[in-house]
Amino acid sequence: MTTRYIFVTGGVVSSLGKGIAAASLAAILEARGLNVTIMKLDPYINVDPGTMSPTQHGEVFVTEDGAETDLDLGHYERFIRTKMNRRNNFTTGRIYEEVLRKERRGDYLGATIQVIPHITNAIKEKVLAGGEGHDVAIVEIGGTVGDIESLPFLESIRQLGVELGRDRTLFMHLTLVPFLGAAGEVKTKPTQHSVKELRSIGIAPDVLVCRGDRAIPANEKAKISLFCNVEERAVISLKDVDSIYKIPALLKAQGLDQLVTKRFGIDCKEADLAEWEKVVYQEANPVGEVTIGMVGKYIELPDAYKSVNEALKHAGLFNRVSVNIKYIDSQNVEAKGDEVLQGLDGILVPGGFGERGVEGKIMAAQFARENNLPYFGICLGMQVALIEFARHVAGLEGAHSTEFDKNTPHPVVGLITEWINEDGQVEERHEESDLGGTMRLGAQLCHLEEGTKAAAAYKSTTCVERHRHRYEVNNNYKERLEKAGLIFSGLSSDRSLVEMIELPNHPWFVAGQFHPEFTSTPRDGQPLFEGFVAAAYTYQKRDLED
């Protein structure tokens, strides 16, 4: 199979939406019957985002094979059916680490290691490997043209453009075309300068995607075409929209997919975007709404919970309701108590690390349990629910996780020292293990107990979900917690680790050690999120009736 490559760069400012644009183009090409994948090349020096602060970088998206990756890979999986893996995201740090390891082994036979050719060759090898087996590989380059960190990646794709030829490569550049209110017109000069910067390093863009708060007039498109040496039909206007799921239709309406397939000489069917039209319609026409309180510690940057936010919206689509997310700092719960939890239709406690705010999360779980308010716990959200139950129902005073209190009299949650990974191999950890890349990661099989809400949601006695954690339920307390009424509704593949808990006689008090948000998509949803939002809507209607 001959793979074609589309390289996506950005200019003028960061956060233009390269990832969304790349994913939307991929969705159209997939709708035309092509096998598409997307890669993200990140210019930072970290080996991966696994140990980066969520308030700086946003969430860490976990792939099926256990790679800790950029949140853009979540966008990719939500737009196309292809599952991402560790080949779909790599950083400058990863490249340098691998090149230096080869140098230490003597693989370069004493050569002087340089950015060109050694670093650029390593980048090209990864790009080509990531595209294998696909008709089209879209490669997004992180950062902005002109950033010093991006230069090795830009040089690498420039070389690939020469080596693979024009019939296998296409360069798509996103720029900003701002509207100046004082002048009453859009300004193309930033785009011209950005393209000039890109051309100065040897890359001539084939397509310009121009971002702005409004559609670009035809005369301005012609101006951009003239000054940037790009065909007028290849100047694409991408205005702000109220839903990212409208973007595939916007790009298709301007013929971007036809431009790509013609360039690559690919003969394929027309794109059918009926699934996306359905998503947009459902999003615009809810029959009700619910308010979900998300109790966390990284709420100053909602992107820290990007996949959770999107999964709640997807669940809203399947329940025909609009989901309003109220972000609640768990430290505010500690300071103000129940007053910050009023007026909610459900509480969700997402994953997280560290002691700060953990008692507020425990208080939120207690409030939901005692008031029959739908509760959904994810990863740490399951652990705090179990700690709360142990303290206040099972009578285990002072129960805690050893992550937060190593001297707790009842360590109901502790460090996992051994488990079976996705390949069936035994993995071991201890207190002194590195923080990076040492968690239980990736897709794991979970056995669900019949008759539980978990099994009912999945309509199955098994599920496969992705993990990212190093602490687990202490099995020494299982019997006592079960006697107090807690149901262990999900167990690991070898039934040695607790994966899910729930409460009987409660509208919805369900929690999982895994991260189901990573498998939610707007077209398919996710069973647990759908069940949670349905329970929240039912709770709201009953509350109004009362």
From Swiss-Prot:
Residues at which ATP binds: S15, L16, G17, K18, G19, I20, D72, K239, D240, V241
Name by which UniProt lists this protein: CTP synthase
GO terms, molecular function: ATP binding; CTP synthase activity; glutaminase activity; identical protein binding; metal ion binding
UniProt-listed GO biological process terms: 'de novo' CTP biosynthetic process; pyrimidine nucleobase biosynthetic process
GO cellular component assignments: cytosol
Pathway: Pyrimidine metabolism; CTP biosynthesis via de novo pathway; CTP from UDP: step 2/2
Residues engaged in binding UTP: S14, K187, T188, K189, P190, T191, Q192, K223
Function: Catalyzes the ATP-dependent amination of UTP to CTP with either L-glutamine or ammonia as the source of nitrogen. Regulates intracellular CTP levels through interactions with the four ribonucleotide triphosphates.
Assigned EC number: 6.3.4.2
The reaction(s) this protein catalyses: UTP + L-glutamine + ATP + H2O = CTP + L-glutamate + ADP + phosphate + 2 H(+); L-glutamine + H2O = L-glutamate + NH4(+); UTP + NH4(+) + ATP = CTP + ADP + phosphate + 2 H(+)
Organism listed in the record: Shewanella halifaxensis (strain HAW-EB4)
Residue ranges annotated for the Glutamine amidotransferase type-1 domain, each copy included: 291-542
Miscellaneous comment: CTPSs have evolved a hybrid strategy for distinguishing between UTP and CTP. The overlapping regions of the product feedback inhibitory and substrate sites recognize a common feature in both compounds, the triphosphate moiety. To differentiate isosteric substrate and product pyrimidine rings, an additional pocket far from the expected kinase/ligase catalytic site, specifically recognizes the cytosine and ribose portions of the product inhibitor.
Catalytic residue positions: C379 (nucleophile), H515, E517
Residues annotated for Mg(2+) binding in this entry: D72, E140
Region (Amidoligase domain): 1-266
Keyword line: ATP-binding, Glutamine amidotransferase, Ligase, Magnesium, Metal-binding, Nucleotide-binding, Pyrimidine biosynthesis
Subunit description: Homotetramer.
PROSITE patterns: GATASE_TYPE_1 (PS51273)
Positions that bind CTP: S14, D147, I148, E149, K187, T188, K189, P190, T191, Q192, K223
